[in-house]
Each structure stands twice: as C-alpha cells, then as structure tokens.
Amino acid sequence: MRTLDWAVLIATVLAIVSWGVWKTRRIRTADAYLRGEGDRFWTIGLSIMATQASAITFLSMPGQAYDDGLGFIQFYFGLPIAMVLLAWFVLPVYRRLRVYTAYEYLESRFDRKTRQLTAALFLVSRGLAAGLSLYAPALVLTAVLGWPLQITNLTVGVLAVLYTVSGGTRAVSVTQTLQMGIMLCGMLGAFLFVLHALPAGVGLAGMARVAGALGKMHAVVPSLRFDTRYTLWSGLVGGLFVALAYFGTDQSQVQRYLGGASLRESRTGLLFNALIKVPMQFLILMVGIAVVVFHQFERPPLLWNSVAAGQARQAPGVAAQLDALDARLSQTFAAKRAGVLSLLQGDESAKPAILALEEQEKSLRGEARALVRRNAPPGQASDADSIFLTFVLRHFPPGLVGLLLAVIICAALSATASALNALGATSAVDFWRPLRPQATDEEQLRAARLFTVGWGVVAMSFAAFASLLDNLIQAVNILGSIFYGPMLGVFLVGFLLKRIQGTAVFVAALAAQACVVAMWLASDVGFLWYNVAGCVLVIALAVVLQAVVGNARPAQPFKANPGGAP
C-alpha cells in the first residue's frame, strides 16, 4: 500500500460515512427512521443491488471463478423471474398494508405467533450473515495492515453502526447509491487492467479461448443431478425460490423497496435489479477468469494465503512437503504454458493436454490446501478467498489498489448497514412494539436505534468465527438456504392458500425447518434445493394439518401503520 492508495481508501470511506450522516441529520421520527423517504427507482434498484453485493461478493466470487469457472452464475438465473413476480403480486400487498416489516403481513393474514416465528428465523439467519459480511473486509485490512481480526471487525462494524443509527433506512439508501457506483467502477477497472496486462495479442477473444480450454467457461450445466451444486435447473428452480425468499421475505431487502415514493417507483426499482444484477455478477466472475488466464503466462503461487502457508510450514515435515508440491507445480505450469501458447497459435489439438494439466494443478493445490488446514492454527482465511486480494496487492498499480480496497470496504459497509437496519427494525416492530403498544414515537425511535446497536455487537462477535469457513460466498448462500425455504413457504401459503390458518402453518414451518436442518447435516443435496424442499414442505404440511385441525377462530384484523402511501 502506497500513499496514494491510502488517500483513495480513506477519502472514499470517510466521504460515504459523512454523506450518510449529513443527509439524514433531520431524521427525528420513528416512521422516517423505519420507512425512509420517497426514493426514486434508481436509488431503490442500486440499494437492492448493494445490499446483496457484500464484500464477500468481491472477495470470494473471483476466487470461485478462478477455481471452478463461471458455473456459479447459474445461482442467479432465477432472480429476474423472481423480481417480476414480486413487483406485480407481493409489493402491492405490502404497500396497501403500509407495513414497516414483511412479517407484519403475516399477522394480518395468520396470527402473531406465525409473524414472530418467521421474524425470528430472519433474525437468526441475517444476524449470522451480518457477521460474515463484517469478516470479509476484516480479512482485507488484516492482510494489508497486519491488525488482529478483532480490531478490524470493530473498525468496520462501528462505521456501519454510526450512520445506520444516525439515519436509519434513509441513511442506508443514500449511501448505497454512492457505494454501488464505486463498486461497479472498481470491478470494471479491475477487469480492464487484467485484460490489458495479458500478453500482446491475447485480448478478450484470446482470453475466452484460453479459459475455455481450461474448462472455466461452462456457464450453463444442464445436469439433473441433485448432488451437483450449480446447474441450469438448480439455478432456475432453486435460484427462483431463494430469490423469492430473499427479496420477498428478508427484511434487509424488503426495507429497500418499501421506501419508494410510489408503487410505480418501487416496482421499477425491482425490475431495474432484474436487468442489471446478473450482468454485474457475470462481470465479477469474469475478473476471476481474467486472473486465471493471466496466470497461464506468469506462474501462480501454490498457495494464495501466504500467512497461513507460512504458519503451516513451521510444523515438522510440512515445509518439505510444500516445497515438493511447489516444484511439481512449476513443472505443470511450464508444460501448460507451452500448450496455451500453441493453442493461441492455432493448435486446437493442445486443448486436451491443457485441460489435463489444469486438473493436475488443481490437484496439487488441493493437496497443499489440505496440508495447511491440518497444520496451520485455526481461524485462518481460506486460500480461495485470498486469491483476488493477493493478486490485487501484487500486480495492481498505485491508486487502483486503493480503489479496489475501497470497493471491498464499501460493499462491507453497505451489506452490514442494510442488515443492521433490518435487524433493528424487525426487533423493534415485530417483538418490542407488541409488548409496548402505547409507546411514544420517541420511545419507538430510541428502541429501534438501540436494537441496531445491539445487533451490531452480535455481528462483530460472530465475525470472529467466520474464518473457520472454507469459502465465504458459499457459506452465506448455504446459511440463507437453510432458513429461506420455510420462510418463503409461510408467505406463499398466506398469499395463495386462503383457507389455511395460523396454527397449521406455524406447526408446518417448525417441522419443515427441522427437516431442512437435517437435510443439511445428513445429505449431499446441493444447497439450492434446500429452498425448494423447505418451501414445499411448509405448503404440504400446512394443507394436511389444516384438514386435521379444521377451522379455527380467525385472527384479529391487522391495523395498518400510519404514514405510508398505499
């Protein structure tokens, strides 16, 4: 890190935090804090994207592409369909009821226990995910500054809490517009830099050709196997379910589009996300592909996390084993480089050998990673998550390093602020306010802010354990998939099956959640199918249970919140 990098990083982060605090300095009521103000569609769309695009996205996805290629893009194939369905069928209901949280709808449709069960599932899943979102930039700052994870977690966490507590939903939205612009510019700049750094004559077409020979360009895998993690069908079906659950029932996203100036603005914001999100994720994956191709001409390291590798080498015999693997990697790289050069000169027969050598390199790196996991102290960052950061620090010019680090910090602030804002709002609205129905507006505002601070402490505490996970982007998605299916099932029963009442869906949700956890612990089913299984189980069990228990006393009518536009 040079002086210019520090200047870019510090100026960017301080400007965003200051902007959020200043723009929302007049927030004085609970309604303004929880609901926000009338946002236009581009603010809503960018805020939705920024909420999902955490620092984990920018750290892990290039590493995911480096290791496994473009297949991860299939995870997002169901997203555009989900946006259309939510914009036309779910959003109007939320706005008509003038809800602060999605879970208030469940009390109007079922009863309070169903509302609070679903809200509790959200609090658990999003509270843990917020910790993961904090850990990712802590990984960056630890690598650059050498600070302990606890200090870096605290630094980023406190910054996110500062402007979220200050301005609530509006502060999150106005800062995310800037953050998303910085993220997109940074990743586009990274891709163009790596593309320019390739040998003369390679270019975009040559990059795609080499990546294809390495087996990295399979963006669509039409497999029907349930144990294959990313396929066309798991993306379209499982991805649709997870997107419906995430954007339709996760308060961190629902809160983004409930703040629209009108139904039309909120609806257009969702459709904006449908158009832009998949290309953005493709760009981030292509950064990883570009790094792969770059390292067909310049030897890559055996291990990307040099800190963990250095610690593992202290164990008896490990240094010799890693040195032997490194020597074999040099031989594999030399042979593969020769094959790639032949391919670029028109020799198509080199492709099988290139692919075989790529698999050999992955095997060598896998052996080395296993050695490190067994011998390094616990709590190290995974090797895959270190790929992009290590490449940036080694190869990017001054200024661009600072911009890319700012991208990662901005993404962390954005995702963490959205999560804390939603966690605080859900705790206050769905749990505290029913206990204090006569609370004044000032008391409600104070409670929401205190809950936000409390969840910030929880997230920072959990972040200390995130480094035990193998790949952060997959950990976040698996965590969400465990809870999202049952949550979506409850909402779908509410919207589609009008005869089913609260007790039946409440018991069905508990049983389905237990089944999904058992599936996660005891099977090899790809995690995207957890969403489908959980949702279908809730619906099926609720139908059966309602037939058994029969009609029950209807829930009391839900009183819409004041101040919202229908």
Model-derived regions: residue spans:
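Membrane-embedded helix-loop-helix hairpins and adjacent transmembrane boundary segments
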Residues: 1-566
